[in-house]
Amino acid sequence: MFRNQYDTDVTTWSPAGRLFQVEYAMEAVKQGSACVGLRSRTHAVLAAANKAASELSSHQRKVFRVADHAGVALAGLTADGRVLSRFLRSECINHAFVYDAPLPVSRLALRLADKAQVCTQRSWKRPYGVGLLVAGLDESGAHLYYNCPSGNYFEYQAFAIGSRSQAAKTFLERRFEGYNDYTPEQLIKDALSAIKETLQGEKLTSSNCTVAIVGRKDDGTVEPFEMIDVKRIQEIIDSMEAAEEAPAAEAESSSMQEEDKGTDAAPMDI
Amino acid sequence: MRFGSDSDQDPWQQPMDGSHASGSKAVADGPGTQRTQYPYVTGSSIIALKYKDGVIMASDTGASYGSTLRYKSVERIKAVGKHSLIGASGEFSDFQEILRYLDELTLSDHMWDDGNSLGPKEVHSYLTRVMYNRRNKFDPLWNSLVIGGVKKGPKGEEKYLGMVNMIGTHFEENHIATGFGNHMAIPILRTEWREDMTFEEAVKLVEKCLLVLLYRDRSSINKFQIAKITTEGATIYPPYSLKTYWGFAAFENPAQGAVGSW
């Protein structure tokens, strides 16, 4: 009668050792439009593909400033994402009030993950249906974390989440080794290229993406988390397209990789 | 500075048998609890200043029970974490409580095991919040605290020296003196302090201040402790005494030239 007897509440295990509700929440992340994040030693960049729900509506915001030194990009249920970014903001502001110093990014990601974890262990709760890329700056440099509804979190050099993010990941995997020494400008370009991979033929313009950056200049001064101006994004996109056309457009290779579903991934695998 | 100077409200005139509850000064915190509203065992001045390699801090090792010099060998300067020193004037048990708070903080940093640690600026800010919060509960921690330290920041090594007192007043300075030192040592520090002092010069200056305090502050004793904090960490030196000279004319005949009845 029931297709699955083990997915009616979050805390019930399947005999195979899986928590279906948690996995469903992780599926929700894949439904949202894509986000990418990447970092050098000194800067971290977040970018998101914006998709309007209908022709008549505007898109939802997917990139949020948390504090001067940190921000998030989210994929999945944006409503859940807003709740979590408000939580992050209050954690940061409380830490700043008490210690007069920014909350280290690793601690920020940890608190977020702990909050998500609680939802996987309480029968009266549901997991958050949102994945967050947390980018920020602290004493040890720039950082990028991915926070999953399961309560797992990982640090990355570069990562992508959301629908068709596999294409962006493939792009990033080819190039991440040089990212540590990238300039902010180079990071932004790669972020845009990665986002473009997820659009599947749709044209990348400044109106269907958001880019934000945080980092530290060589002299130690902080460049606070900031959305990059629409005009500047368009300029960068234009310059990228110009550069692409110059060396005889190298056919849109066979990069039409679909998402890697189908494979029997281990339950907690991202 | 450290405790109320109105003679008719002198804490030492209050009964010590716990009958504060009937007095207007006591604050009851629900039934059955009664908090200390006055200092009992107090330490005197702390002197601290930045020098070339870090921050130096000094005090005597005395603690008074009222005006009785009751304890002669207490450490009023302690290391906090890896980057800071804290020195305290005022109520000694309140200082011990503050040390417990700070231990808790550094221990939890250690347990997170993520490489993050509190620098002197963070410790100072934290203590500012604690002190002001307790003052607002009318249950102050009866201290003047000095926080000094060095920590590597994005712009290189950064020296830090700040203080906070029992009512939450707080500031940063190149040289700080609490208690009687605020009156007696600050003028000396203002004229003689330099940014690029060597440790030896700093010790000389600090000793000059301590000696003046020894001559003029009745609650100071001739047993001093010096501590320094640099990038290498904190060093608290064993106590020692200074050579005194009581043959000054003003000491021989203090009443001479003094206008007044004494």
UniProtKB/Swiss-Prot annotation, chain A:
Residues 245-256 have a biased composition (Low complexity). One of its GO terms (cellular component) is nucleus. The gene is PAF1. This is Proteasome subunit alpha type-1. The keyword rRNA-binding does not apply. Pfam families: Proteasome, Proteasome_A_N. InterPro entries: Ntn_hydrolases_N (IPR029055), Proteasome_alpha (IPR050115), Proteasome_alpha-type (IPR023332), Proteasome_alpha1 (IPR035144), Proteasome_asu_N (IPR000426), Proteasome_sua/b (IPR001353). The proteasome is a multicatalytic proteinase complex which is characterized by its ability to cleave peptides with Arg, Phe, Tyr, Leu, and Glu adjacent to the leaving group at neutral or slightly basic pH. The proteasome has an ATP-dependent proteolytic activity. It is found in: Cytoplasm; Nucleus. Transmembrane segments: none annotated. Belongs to the peptidase T1A family. The 26S proteasome consists of a 20S proteasome core and two 19S regulatory subunits. The 20S proteasome core is composed of 28 subunits that are arranged in four stacked rings, resulting in a barrel-shaped structure. The two end rings are each formed by seven alpha subunits, and the two central rings are each formed by seven beta subunits. The catalytic chamber with the active sites is on the inside of the barrel.
